Amino acid sequence: MFTVRPAFSDVTFEGANNEIVILTGDIEAEEFDEILAEIKAKKPTQMILDSEGGNGHSARRLAKYVNDNNISTYISGVAKCRSACAIIFLAGKKRLCEGVLGIHQASLPKDIGNEEVNMNYALKYIQEDIGNLIELLNDFNTPSFVYPYMLKTTEMYNFSQEEIAQINTVKSLDEM
C-alpha cells in the first residue's frame, strides 16, 4: 500500500497489482504532478472517489488521464464527490455513483479572483474555461442535463438518485 500527500488528503493503492486507487479529501495543486506520475506508474483500472473538490485544473488533468486509460470511477454509498471531484468521476467510461454527486458553477482562481482584475479579462477567462470544460465533458459522454446545473448553480447542486441513474454507465460493481 502507498500513500502520498497533500495533493489529495489521501491517495492509497490497493489490490495485488495496485488495480484500485482510492482518492479522498481535497484536490490541491501542490504535489499533483507527483501523484499523477504515481497513478500513471501503477496503472490502476478502478478509481474510488470521496472528495468535496478542490483545484479544477488538477482535476481536469486527472480526468483526462482517467478517460484516456479506461479507468472506471466509483463513489461508494457513504462517499461524496463534489465540485472538481465530479469532473474526475464523469471521466470514467464505466462509472457508478452510489453516494453523493454534486456540482456548481465555476469561479475565478484565487490569483485572478480579486477586485482589481479587469472585467473583460475575467469574462474572457471564464468563457474560455467553461468552453474547455464542456468540450472535456462532451468527450466523457456526460449527459446534457448536467450542464445547466454546472452553469447556473452558485451553491452546490447534489444530483437526485434518478439523475445519478442517468449519469451512471453501469448498474453494479460487478459490471466494473
Summary of predicted features, one role per range:
Residues 1-3:
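Bacterial N-terminal signal peptides
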Residues 7-34:
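STAS-typified acidic loop motif
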Residues 23, 47, 89, 164:
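Terminal peptide-recognition signature
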Residues 31, 39-43, 51, 66-70, ...:
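Sec/Tat-exported extracytoplasmic proteins
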Residues 32-36, 59-63, 67, 85-86, ...:
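Extracytoplasmic/secreted envelope proteins and their assembly/folding machinery
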Residues 44-58, 72-79:
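Short, glycine-/small-residue-enriched flexible loop/hinge segments at domain edges that mediate gating
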Residues 67, 71-112:
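Glycine-rich beta-to-alpha active-site loop
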Residues 109-176:
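Charged, glycine-interspersed solvent-exposed loop segments at helix/strand-loop junctions
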